[in-house]
A protein has these predicted regions:
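Hydrophobic alpha-helical and helix-loop surface patches within well-folded domains
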Residues: 229, 260-536
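C-terminal outer-membrane beta-barrel translocator/porin domains of Gram-negative envelope proteins
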Residues: 730-737, 743-873, 877-880, 884-885, ...
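Extended, low-hydrophobicity, Ser/Thr/Pro/Gly-biased non-transmembrane segments
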Residues: 85-100, 114, 123-124, 128-135, ...
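Solvent-exposed beta-hairpin/edge-strand motifs
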Residues: 63-113, 201, 551-553
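N-terminal, polar/Ser/Thr-rich
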Residues: 20-44, 502-503, 507
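Outer-membrane beta-barrel initiation region
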Residues: 546, 556-563, 571-578, 585-680, ...
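Beta-strand-rich binding/interaction modules
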Residues: 209-210, 501-502, 515-518, 522-586
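Short loop/turn motifs that connect adjacent beta-strands in outer-membrane beta-barrel proteins
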Residues: 617-623, 641-643, 676-685, 697, ...
Length: 935
């Protein structure tokens, strides 16, 4: 069958002897003639490459990247169960195989296959490069023609790219051998632009959506359809999406053909995407230069998730964003989708249109795409107030979403807040750095996207918005279709703006500088014609000019620029009205590590039920301490640094129907919580729950604890060339009090643990707990251990083993500190005691369904359904004061676990189970329900 497809693929070739309409003459040209074979999950065929030597020196070989071989082997550093999440039936390889290389006359050429050095990843390094030996040296700017016969395989996977999932094939870059500079051997990831054209043959039941200026359906012969794909300008690839279930809607903008391809039930999003896309293209084109494509398609990707990906002439959108568009509220993710489309469309200018080294200098791609998209979003939806979910209408669900997520601001909480967390965790380092040299791989995404955007925003503040936009337009004119490096962009911007940017680039791109400006105080004195105010300022970190804005008593403002050349200084403001407050960097243009001290006086905002309906939303700004008051309690916090809350409600444990209200609500329940993140290795938390608290009599049940959490990181191998930091060991020190007031017993607990989840799927924890004598209980101490291990029997088939053991070290434990087997489902009253042994084994079967997407009342969707069976049991004994039968109890059961969609990509696991007692007194078969996070 494969041979017959290859024959039919040639039927239309006579009509397309020349597929180039306006391709540049100084770039290489690719003429691809390929066929999709769904049986083998491969694209097979040939490429005729008219190669131009643009290296500036004579060469005797051509280097081709075989990108498909990056996925030829599984990652040996990850436990196989982690890999299962990416694949349909366990690991499935991608690869590109070379069948032969010939010259322009059809004569065989010598070639070799080379491995890669571990510059991007540390596994699957074999066969990365095809090296074609030239019969004689090729002079600079000269051409040579070679034809490569190849076959590339799609993985059966949910890896977003280079895969086939549910009959839809997706591959953006490098499905064909790509000629690359020889320097790539030493690192970097470059995709030179070339004049690409192709004929693609597929079974007639498949539809093709390719990123090409023109896609023409030629004819169908013997059940096979051939498409012609051409481009008017050099591109970096012809991205492909091929599937049986895809449909499309079309539109146009300024003569550019727009398409949106969607899977079943995705039409509403497709039409919305076309509407957004027209607005986005108009904005980007007007401000950042001409779009270099004649056709653009948006495609719903088959893999779930809230993500977007771009390639030449194509934007892919994760299926979850499409399918959850109106769930659980109408238009729930419309703003998020608009931003994502703006980001991916920006790549048609930066990253794809203007190329870069996607390894060391990916800032030019992702940082610039963030700058274009967030600038667009803020000009349309505002930049300082909540703006991601404020478009939702009234309603019960909508109001709940507003309470939980209504504060979100795109820039503040999706860019600045992650950057601040990066600083707190100590994962910052230069933006421009190859993967293999990264000291903190954990921070790579935040540095490239979030910090990268903030650096461009600061650059705009430094040179001016008009100058930066002029530089971006000029870069689009001069570098589209080429590879732009950071130094060339710096030189271009300096020329346009007339500003020396060496220090700025050294601080923020080649270095890991930070910045913080603070208003220490101000003094106002009366002058002859008004008032004179001296503002005292302080700066740490990089030198950046700062706007200082003062608000006057009459509501007007005055501003002045502080150049911040010294670490401390002052400026003088003249005004006709007294100054009441001062704000440094009021438009939040600079990557400030602490915006709270940008105000004088400091901002403390109070949200309460009696605020005017016309008052602006307070949200959760990064420059203010926010306190919220509700009928049941009070809460507050600052950024992600710390949060606290206090909630008090009447205790309903008594007779709620009593005639005397005092009898019904004679006590209260109080919950207090506090959490603070200090740095990568240290955090603190405190919780206190007082149940049936009678303040007058000093009675009630109390469970309170204050914990110091410490983490020790290691650098396990992850398959990436960079250094990854994982919290392998932890130590928690807890001071608490537990029991009935006034005799509640204070205690201290030391817990240590180790996680080897990445390579072994193994976790262990030990804890020692000791009561503090003299407060109503005797002295005692306990020790306990718990562990978990997952064994992979086959793809998606697991054997989970968990165990617990606890015993006293000395003394007699009180009831509040005794053990009981609370995981048992078939025993209503398992015994208490100061000794316990407990174990559980689970057999987790492959999912009955996966990524089902079954809606439930338009509130959520069932994604996965997993069946499992378990046996668990143990014994608790010694010093019992409550339920005291100390025999062994064992039960068996089965569960169906439904994984449902949460909010913003989070999931919940709801398990419905049935347990049967096997051994022990008082057992009774029972149905149970559990809610947890998916493992």
């Amino acid at each position: 069958m494969r041979r017959s497809w290859g024959v039919n693929a040639l039927v239309a070739l006579a009509a397309i002897a020349s597929t180039w309409t306006a391709a540049a003459n100084d770039v290489s040209q690719y003429d691809l003639r390929v066929t999709l074979d769904p049986t083998e999950q491969t694209i097979v065929g040939s490429e005729r490459v008219d190669y131009v030597n643009d290296s500036g020196r004579a060469i005797d070989e051509i280097l081709f990247l075989l990108y498909g071989n990056a996925g030829a082997e599984p990652n040996p550093d990850l436990h196989p169960a982690h890999l299962d999440a990416q694949y349909v039936h366990g690991f499935d390889p991608t690869w590109t195989r070379i069948r032969g290389v010939t010259d322009a006359d059809g004569r065989a050429m010598e070639y070799d296959i080379e491995s890669s050095s571990p510059t991007l990843q540390t596994y699957s390094l074999e066969d990365w490069f095809l090296v074609v030996a030239l019969p004689e040296p090729l002079a600079p700017d000269e051409r040579v023609t070679v034809t490569v016969e190849f076959e590339t395989r799609f993985a059966s996977a949910i890896t977003l790219d280079n895969c086939v999932y549910r009959g839809t094939y997706v591959w953006r870059f490098g499905w064909n051998p790509v000629a690359v500079p020889p320097s790539i051997r030493d690192g970097g990831f470059l995709l030179p632009a070339a004049a690409y054209g192709a004929t693609l043959t597929v079974p007639e039941e498949y539809r093709v959506f390719a990123g090409a200026d023109r896609q023409t359906k030629l004819d169908t012969v013997a059940g096979l359809t051939t498409y012609e794909l051409t481009n008017e300008h050099p591109v970096r690839s012809i991205p492909l999406v091929i599937g049986r279930d895809l449909e499309a809607v079309t539109a146009s903008w300024e003569g550019i053909d727009l398409e949106a391809a969607y899977l079943p039930s995705g039409e509403a999003f497709a039409r919305l995407a076309l509407s957004y896309l027209a607005e986005i293209l108009a904005y980007h084109s007007e401000r950042f230069g001409t779009l270099g494509y004649r056709r653009l398609i948006v495609v719903e990707a088959p893999a779930p998730g809230f993500y977007g990906m771009a390639a030449d002439g194509m934007i892919l959108v994760g299926r979850s964003l499409v399918q959850l568009k109106d769930m659980p509220a109408l238009g729930m993710y419309d703003r998020l989708a608009e931003y994502l489309l703006a980001h991916e469309a920006a790549h048609l200018w930066w990253g794809i249109g203007i190329g870069t080294d996607f390894d060391a200098e990916n800032w030019i791609s992702e940082g610039f795409a963030e700058y274009l998209s967030i600038t667009y979003f803020e000009e349309k939806h505002g930049g300082s107030e909540p703006n991601l979910f404020t478009h939702l209408g009234p309603g019960l669900v909508e109001d709940l979403i507003g309470i939980e997520l209504g504060y979100l601001n795109l820039r503040q909480h999706l860019s600045e807040s992650p950057y601040l967390d990066l600083l707190r965790l100590g994962f910052d380092e230069p933006i421009v750095r190859p993967t293999a040299e990264l000291e903190y791989l954990n921070g790579q995404t935040v540095r490239t996207y979030s910090k990268g955007y903030l650096v461009l925003r600061a650059l705009e503040s430094l040179v001016g918005r008009d100058a930066l936009r002029d530089a971006l337009v000029r870069a689009n004119e001069e570098w589209r279709g080429r590879i732009l490096d950071v130094e060339s962009f710096r030189a271009l911007t300096e020329e346009v703006a007339g500003v020396d940017l060496a220090a700025f680039f050294n601080d923020w791109l080649y270095g890991a500088e930070t910045f913080d400006v603070a208003v220490d105080r101000f003094e106002t004195v009366a002058a002859d014609d008004g008032y004179e105010t001296t503002v005292h300022l302080r700066r740490t970190g990089a030198v950046l000019p700062v706007e200082v804005r003062a608000t006057l008593a009459d509501g007007s403002t005055v501003s002045r620029l502080w150049h911040a050349g010294t670490s401390a200084g002052s400026i003088v403001l003249d005004s006709t009205s007294p100054v009441v407050r001062v704000h440094a960097d009021p438009d939040e243009m600079l990557p400030d590590a602490n915006r709270f001290d940008n105000h004088w006086p400091r901002q403390i905002l109070v949200n309460h039920p009696f605020r005017s309906e016309d008052a602006p939303d307070i949200g959760r700004p990064l420059d203010a301490y926010v306190i919220s008051i509700s009928p049941t309690g009070i809460s507050g916090g600052f950024r992600n640094d710390h949060q606290w809350s206090l909630v008090a409600m009447p205790h309903l444990g008594g007779d709620a129907f009593a005639a005397d209200i005092a009898d019904a609500f004679g006590a209260i329940d109080v919950v207090v919580a506090f959490a603070a993140n200090i740095d990568r290795s240290l955090s603190v938390s405190a919780t206190a729950m007082a149940t049936a608290l009678d303040v007058a009599n000093g009675t009630g049940d109390l469970d309170a604890q204050f914990t110091l959490h410490t983490r020790r990181f290691s650098n396990p191998e992850t398959g990436s060339a960079g250094t990854y930091w994982y919290p392998t060991q932890w130590l928690d020190l807890t001071f608490g009090v537990r029991g009935e007031l006034p005799q509640a017993a204070p205690y201290v607990e030391l817990a240590v643990g180790r996680s080897d989840a990445i390579p072994l799927y193994l976790e262990n924890a030990f804890a020692v707990r000791a009561a503090i004598p003299g407060f109503g209980s005797g002295s005692f101490a306990t020790i306990e251990w718990s562990g978990f291990k997952r064994f992979r029997l086959a793809p998606h088939l697991y054997f989970d083993l968990s165990a617990f053991a606890g015993a006293p070290l000395f003394g007699r434990t009180t009831t509040e500190f005794q053990y009981w087997m609370d995981r048992l489902e078939a025993f209503a009253l398992p015994p208490y005691g100061d000794h316990q042994l407990f174990g559980r084994v689970d057999l987790v079967l492959p999912p009955l369904v996966r990524n089902l997407g079954y809606p439930i009342l338009n509130l959520t969707r069932i994604e996965d359904v997993v069946a499992s069976a378990f046996v668990q049991g143990g014994r608790t004994w010694g010093s019992c004061t409550l339920v005291c039968e100390s025999g062994i109890r064992v039960e068996a059961g089965a569960m169906l676990t439904f994984v449902v969609d949460g909010v913003l990509g989070g999931n919940l696991a709801i398990s419905l189970g049935y347990a049967v007692p096997l051994l022990g007194l008082d057992g009774e078969s029972s149905v149970f329900l559990e809610v947890s996070l998916p493992r």
